[in-house]
Amino acid sequence: MKLLSKIMIIALAASMLQACNGPGGMNKQGTGTLLGGAGGALLGSQFGKGKGQLVGVGVGALLGAVLGGQIGAGMDEQDRRLAELTSQRALETAPSGSNVEWRNPDNGNYGYITPNKTYRNSTGQYCREYTQTVVIGGKQQKAYGNACLQPDGQ
């Protein structure tokens, strides 16, 4: 299954869970926890085979949920939109080691993406390691990840 398809399934599941949460839906921290856990599980599933892969899913889900909850607690929709657009631009065009920053003028939250090593994975996809730093209400959170291009260029 393509990564994009998996992400769409996760996003759909998250929105359905929000709808079940009653009027007003889930708060930002709950959404961040849910999406972080799902994203972490997806990332963890890319490593190992058999039981090792299950461990990767579990560890990825746990770490993603914790980090997602912390970040989601303070980020609003504009923060998320700015971070997403900046991430895409940084991973596609920025030189390794450079910081590409976003800043929300309405609340002072900001962050930056630092793309690092570019490589080809075992299936031939071009991938890039990155560091994402987010400062919400003066508190810094840092996450590390890998992003890979799909065969269709996404």
Curated annotation (Swiss-Prot):
Covalent lipidation (S-diacylglycerol cysteine), chain numbering: 20
Entry keywords, A to Z: Cell outer membrane, Lipoprotein, Membrane, Palmitate, Signal
Presence of the UniProt keyword Transmembrane helix in the record: no
Subcellular localization(s) per the UniProt record: Cell outer membrane
This protein's record includes keyword Secreted: no
Membrane topology, record value: Lipid-anchor
Domain of life: Bacteria
Secretion signal, residue range per the UniProt entry: 1-19
Lipid linkage positions (N-palmitoyl cysteine): 20
GO cellular component: cell outer membrane
Family: Belongs to the rickettsiale 17 kDa surface antigen family.
Protein name: 17 kDa surface antigen
